[in-house]
């Protein structure tokens, strides 16, 4: 079966074009675990199936590296947009892509006939604790105290189609013990569906530095929905302006949001093809 390895700011997935070669979704979960292994597989943060859409131009079906189903991936959706354009599945530079029922509109950035990135309408942030979901009496869930391993943190919880807990720290997140603390947030009992966790340092009113621990995948070099959630949390806290650059380990994403709960968050960033190949399933 043919595959393409792609990444957005280092957040890499293995993509299967199921418009041309259908795949059983029961197989996909097992395949995600096998192929995501960076020593014995292709290596990636998971796999993404590209299918024809029913309520959108295309549908993306995402599986994390542990085989669990992912609801949305901001970096992945940009790569899907690049794939369908570069492989002539569409000639449109604005496409709609669905993931677990949520439809996003993507403006594809093209240079010399090749898609190099995309700007995505990520929809309005979800700040209702029950819908995120997170167990808290704080509405909206801003600066919520949480005790993790005898340390009290303050987090702001946001859903961008998947749950995020954003923690602002007073130093570069490169110095933060993410490998120890991230899993404790992911599996904390206040998150019924687990959570993605971002540890962020506000450099100035236009720049945020961030590391992320993704549920089901661990640390990744970038997380598009996490960058959106972090920008939303920072704007709610009054730390930054309405347009910011989020600096991740794998690259930069531009995020904008008006600060109004009903308005969409817009994410802009690159999409890159690494290589293509064939694998026996």
Residues of each region from the PLM?
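N-terminal, positively charged, Ser/Thr/Ala/Gly-biased leader segments
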Residues: 1-22, 120, 136-158
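Membrane helix-loop-helix hairpins that form the core translocation module of multi-pass transporters
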Residues: 117-119, 123-125
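A glycine-rich beta-to-alpha transition motif near the start of alpha/beta enzyme domains, typified by
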Residues: 1-114, 165-281
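Glycine-rich beta-alpha junction loops
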Residues: 124-126, 160-164, 271
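Short, basic/low-complexity N-terminal boundary segments at the transition from targeting/disordered tails
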Residues: 127-130, 178
